[in-house]
Swiss-Prot record:
Gene3D superfamilies noted in UniProt: Ribosomal protein l15e
Keywords assigned: Cytoplasm, Ribonucleoprotein, Ribosomal protein
Similarity comment text for this entry: Belongs to the eukaryotic ribosomal protein eL15 family.
Molecular-function annotations in GO: RNA binding; structural constituent of ribosome
Annotated PROSITE patterns: RIBOSOMAL_L15E (PS01194)
GO cellular component, one term: cytosolic large ribosomal subunit
UniProt-listed PANTHER family: LARGE RIBOSOMAL SUBUNIT PROTEIN EL15, RIBOSOMAL PROTEIN L15
Compartments (UniProt record): Cytoplasm
InterPro entries in the record: Rbsml_eL15_core_dom_sf (IPR024794), Ribosomal_eL15 (IPR000439), Ribosomal_eL15_CS (IPR020925), Ribosomal_uL23/eL15/eS24_sf (IPR012678)
The name this protein goes by in its record: Large ribosomal subunit protein eL15
One BP term from GO: cytoplasmic translation
Keyword Cytoplasm: yes
Alphabetical list of NCBIfam families matching this protein: PRK04243.1
Amino acid sequence: MGAYKYMQELWRKKQSNVMRFLLRVRCWQYRQLSSLHRAPRPTRPDKARRLGYKAKQGYVIYRIRVRRGGRKRPVPKGATYGKPVHHGVNQIKFARSLQSVAEERAGRHCGGLRVLNSYWVGEDSTYKFFEVILIDTFHKAIRRNPDTQWITKAVRKHREMRGLTSAGKKSRGLGKGHKFHLTIGGSRRAAWKRRNTLQLHRYR
């Protein structure tokens, strides 16, 4: 096994004494830093490489702190107006994962970079910490490499805002196999529309 395989096994055993200590110390360190800051290198090089990171020019890592828990509806004094069925303020669950929220915040802060992917690096009772891989699409090392030219296209701008990253697709219910029947045809809405539309063909 290579070194990265050993690192992967270390991260799989998060309840081991070594990892419990490491994660505890790192969470303390991340709490002292700002909620969004640039990391000099990936905390999990094995995971970052599996998600497309390369230790070369044009690749940037940002570490994001996201507050855990549900989403409170932002209404003044709890006044939602309308019918009682929509009066909920506190027990609202956000449709997307905290990881996709972290990607969105990184993408907003670094508008000139493209979000490639992200991964979990730690959590405590209040926060979750993610590292987001961003790519500078105007760097020659990225533009001249056939493997990374796809992300330099204009259509890839703000992938994280449109649910096109891995974390974003997960909350949209997209995937392959028998677990993803609800999105056959592109999306939940497309699948629902097809199943609930009566088609009366002329010759039937």
